[in-house]
Curated annotation (Swiss-Prot):
Its EC number is 1.14.-.-. Keywords: FAD, Flavonoid biosynthesis, Flavoprotein, Monooxygenase, NADP, Oxidoreductase. Signal peptide: none annotated. Belongs to the aromatic-ring hydroxylase family. KMO subfamily. Pathway: Secondary metabolite biosynthesis; flavonoid biosynthesis. It comes from Aspergillus candidus. This is Monooxygenase cfoF. The keyword Ribonucleoprotein does not apply.
Length: 417
């Protein structure tokens, strides 16, 4: 780094301490180095530091099959060993399974890891990945403020950006903070995006999803799913995702076509949770046991219902002093299976381009050239998965030769350059 860098003496605010926001902050500090004046980077997040089981209780895939995947990013950040230690599966691709409604399973397959990566994919609870990134940020001295949301945005007369900060607990306005660059990583329902791109809204995929985390004390996981994860496919337009979250917990997510999206309740009650379980049992009657057992053993505090939403990515040529990364730019439905990988790479790449470029516009333009096509590939693949998982004309060959599982999980992503 030279001493004449355009970011010297500048203030950067990151809205959102999720995967994308923390990957950005960590790599920016790493790339910036110690031999120039330090950057002033502050991260705000509307959530508390503690875990919300309904939002953080599931696990996700981190891939290491290509250079631009999540595990490679985490290795570059020095966090790979911690992620592998925290994973519930360290050989996730070979454990991926497609079951039919009677639990006949597809053969396993594998994909080589990229370079010297120790594995091609892991499954890790979202809460564990979040904690690893938070602790890394705290250890690096990155300033993170919890329960503070970035509510409003304006361009100031001096060319900087003004951000109104609100206490997420009591709703009180804290202050208006000025900065030279705002990195919006505030999720699929980004408030910053609503202000700057009010027509760029989430689109309903046609799928509703409900599920939770079933508990099996003493390792009494049903043999059908033990040490596996994947999808139950039927020929009834309904499917179910299954994945371990711990030695005793299994996340399940039932999905089906529904004409209009349903919103989750404003407040959760025991009665509503039980009604969701009853609906899940009714909708999944076509799936043989142990699925009913899985539903009945679900921890009520982990139950969820959500509409499958997504949106296309966008570039920043008409925006000034603000960059959207992760879900705030390109939201994926859960069936995309690649959201965390793309978010990690977004954060990492933006930091790298800001440190390498000679001006902010060049950095953001190069970021767009890499991030937008990457997100579009994941979005297109997500729509293919949604269609194949909810067909009424199931291809039985995928249960005999393993090609169905390979196509469903990896598709064309492994061959992307």
């Amino acid at each position: 780094m030279t001493r004449e860098h355009f970011l010297e003496g500048k203030d950067i605010v990151v809205a959102g301490a999720g995967v994308a926001g923390l990957a950005f902050a960590l790599n920016l500090q790493r790339q910036w180095g110690d031999n120039v004046p330090p950057l002033r980077v502050v991260v705000y997040d509307r959530d508390k530091r503690e875990v919300d089981l309904r939002r953080q209780g599931y696990s996700q895939t981190l891939s290491g099959i290509k250079e631009d995947t999540g595990l490679v990013v985490l290795k570059q950040l020095g966090l790979l060993d911690k992620v592998i230690d925290g994973a519930v599966m360290t050989d996730a691709i070979s454990k991926f399974t497609i079951w039919d409604k009677d639990w006949n399973a597809s053969p396993s397959f594998n994909v080589p890891a990229y370079g010297d990566m120790p594995t091609s994919a892991v499954r890790i609870p979202r809460r564990v990945l979040r904690t690893i990134l938070i602790e890394a940020a705290e250890a690096a001295g990155i300033e993170v403020h919890w329960s503070v949301s970035c509510e409003d945005f304006e361009y100031l007369d001096d060319g900087r950006v003004g951000i109104r900060l609100r206490n997420a607990d009591d709703g009180e306005i804290i202050e208006t903070r000025a900065c030279d660059l705002l990195v919006a990583a505030d999720g699929a329902n980004s408030k910053i995006r609503t202000i700057l791109r009010p027509d760029d809204t989430l689109q309903y995929t046609g799928l509703m999803m409900m599920g939770g985390v079933a508990e099996f004390p003493h390792g009494a996981v049903p043999d059908h799913i033990r040490d596996k994860w994947g999808m139950v496919l039927t020929d009834q337009g309904i499917s179910c995702f299954l994945s371990p979250t711990s030695q005793m917990g299994y996340h399940w997510g039932l999905s089906w076509w529904e004409q209009s999206p349903r919103a989750p309740p404003a407040t959760w009650s025991i009665e509503y949770t039980q009604s969701l379980k009853s609906e899940a049992l009714r909708r999944s009657r076509v799936i043989a046991d142990p699925f009913a057992t899985i539903v009945k053993r679900t921890d009520p505090s982990t139950m969820f219902i959500m509409a499958g939403m997504d949106k296309r990515p966008f570039s920043h040529e008409h925006l000034r002093k603000v960059v959207f990364i992760g879900d705030s730019n390109h939201a994926f439905s859960p069936l995309a299976g690649n959201g965390a990988n793309v978010a990690l790479k977004d954060g990492y790449d933006l930091a790298e381009q800001l440190c390498k470029a000679s001006c902010m516009d060049d950095a953001i333009s190069q970021f767009d050239r890499e991030s937008v096509p990457r997100a579009l590939r994941t979005l297109d693949r997500s729509h293919e998965r949604i269609a194949s998982a909810h067909t009424t004309q199931l291809d039985r060959d995928q249960f005999t030769d393993g090609s169905g599982a390979n196509d469903f999980l990896v598709g064309q992503q492994h061959s992307d350059k």
